[in-house]
Each structure stands twice: as C-alpha cells, then as structure tokens.
C-alpha cells in the first residue's frame, strides 16, 4: 500500500525556512557527506532525495564540483533550494516516482544522499524505497542516509506547529533493513540532537554510509 503524503508536503511548504532555523546544527549530516565525497569520482552525478532547502547537502556537494540533482515533494522547499544552490538541478518529485529509465527517468548516479527522508514513510514501504535508491546507483555507487533512532511505525508527532507521521528503527534493525536491500555498510555515526525550537522533540540521529553491492 502506498500512502498519500500530500499532507506531509503541505506541512513542509508551510514550514519553509523555519526548518533550517529549527535545525541549525547539522554536523552529522555534513560529516556523512564528507565521507561520501571521499568515495566519489571527480564531477560525479549525485542525487539528494528529500533535499529540502538544499542546505547543507546540495551546497556541500556542488561546492565540491559535483553535478547535483535534488528532489523533494515540497514545492516550497524547492523554491528555497533553487535560491540557496543555483548551480544544482531541482525537481518536484516523490521518492516513489523516481526511476532510471522511461518518462522522467533520471539515469544512474555515482552517489545518492537521503537524509531523514525515509522516516516519512511507513515501515512497510522503507525496504522498497531502499531498493529503489539502490537501482538509481551505478554498480559500486555510494549511499549516505540518516534516520532517527526510534521504535516507531507511522506515528504522529508534533513538528514546528504541524503533525507529521514518522517511522524509525533501533540501530540493529536499521542495519539489517539496509543490508537486506543490497547495501554494504561502510561507515556509521550517531548524534544526540536537540533542535533549537521547543516545537520539535529531541532525537538520536543515525548516519550510515553504504556501498551498493
């Protein structure tokens, strides 16, 4: 079953630039991209899935000389991203619609980033989403992803004046799900994170760097 996430997109449209204000410290995300950059060839094609405002990831990748495509379901976030990172390409797409070939096909990428995007899916959809991301990578390509560590499945949480439905895994379960989707985990990090806004709960963030096997 594919869940309609229109309401999630509308929430992020309304949140807009307040997202970066509420989450100003993104050391874990920046470090995961640094690990990815060490594995990429020059002028690599890199896809940022759930790119949000384009910061910091699309900017970090573009500044390193790579060809960056960002996709997001929120038109409002994409408008900000185009301003923040004018050298990247931004597309209004749902993760589930991404494909290599055919109408709207994106081709394959040397690297994919997917930070806190999978947590917006019910658990039953996450393994399929990971396999889809794998299909978008060249053989031996690299994925950097993050999730919030939590034993949740499509649970409603308050977030910057809105209610979002989110899922999460405990660490060992996340490793298992990622490995079963066809990835070798090559790096891992975690951060305890307290948002600047009191309208977003504290969280424990997990970052994985992976290679398509």
Predicted regions located by residue number:
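A conserved beta-strand element that flanks and buttresses the S-adenosyl-L-methionine
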Residues: 113-114
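Core SAM-dependent methyltransferase catalytic element
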Residues: 194-213
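Conserved S-adenosyl-L-methionine
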Residues: 184-194
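A short glycine-rich, Lys/Arg-flanked "PGG" loop and its adjoining helix->strand segment in the class I
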Residues: 127-139
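Class I SAM-dependent methyltransferase SAM/SAH-binding core
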Residues: 47, 53-98
């Amino acid at each position: 079953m594919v869940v309609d996430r229109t309401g999630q997109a509308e929430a992020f449209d309304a949140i807009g630039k307040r997202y970066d204000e509420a989450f100003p410290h993104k050391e874990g995300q920046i470090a995961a991209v640094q690990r990815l950059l060490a594995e990429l060839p020059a002028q690599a094609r890199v896809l940022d899935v759930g790119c949000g405002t384009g910061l910091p990831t699309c900017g970090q990748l573009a500044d390193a000389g790579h060809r960056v495509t960002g996709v997001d379901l929120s038109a409002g976030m994409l408008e900000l991203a185009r301003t923040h990172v004018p050298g990247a390409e931004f597309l209004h797409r749902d993760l589930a619609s991404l494909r290599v070939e055919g109408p709207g096909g994106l081709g394959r990428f040397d690297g994919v980033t997917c930070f806190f995007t999978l947590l917006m899916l019910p658990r039953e959809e996450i393994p399929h989403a990971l396999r889809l991301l794998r299909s978008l990578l060249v053989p031996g390509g690299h994925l950097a992803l993050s999730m919030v560590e939590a034993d949740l499945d499509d649970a409603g949480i308050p977030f910057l004046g809105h209610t979002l439905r989110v899922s999460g895994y405990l660490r060992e379960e996340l490793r298992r799900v990622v490995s079963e989707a066809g990835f070798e985990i090559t790096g891992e990090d975690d951060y305890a994170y307290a948002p600047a806004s009191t309208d977003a709960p504290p969280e424990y963030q997990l970052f994985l760097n992976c290679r398509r096997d």
